[in-house]
């Protein structure tokens, strides 16, 4: 079957919304690890500065805590659901889903790791950091 431009757009939109729904479902799923939820937007400058940090945390600390990014410009209801006042906002959750802390604004990797430790989560440096 030949895809017309309109059908191609439809397929792309369905794929995008399915992926977005899966990401949001992952944020709400009952976690087995502590979880960092970062609420931001793809075009927000401090949020863009957070992206490589979140990617690094996801790669190198996946066995210690999970990281979820939610773009609140693409998923407007999520900002209200989490009660954020500005972006980026980082929310730290325990493994049982209880909110432990939140931070508004840019947050450096060392500060995120320090916050986990302050909250009683034993965070160890990875033996060999994953390659970019």
Label each region the model flagged.
Residues 94-127:
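Non-catalytic, surface beta->alpha helical segment in thiol-disulfide oxidoreductase systems
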Residues 48-60:
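Typically the conserved alpha-helix immediately C-terminal to a functionally engaged Cys/Sec
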Residues 2-3, 15-16, 116, 123-132:
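Non-globular targeting/processing and membrane-anchoring segments
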Residues 23-34, 76:
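A short beta-strand-turn-helix
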Residues 35, 40-43, 86:
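Short pre-active-site segment immediately N-terminal to redox-active cysteine/selenocysteine motifs
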Residues 39, 63-76:
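Thiol-based oxidoreductase modules, predominantly thioredoxin-like and allied folds used
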Residues 10-21:
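Bacterial N-terminal signal peptides
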Residues 82-91:
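Structural micro-motif
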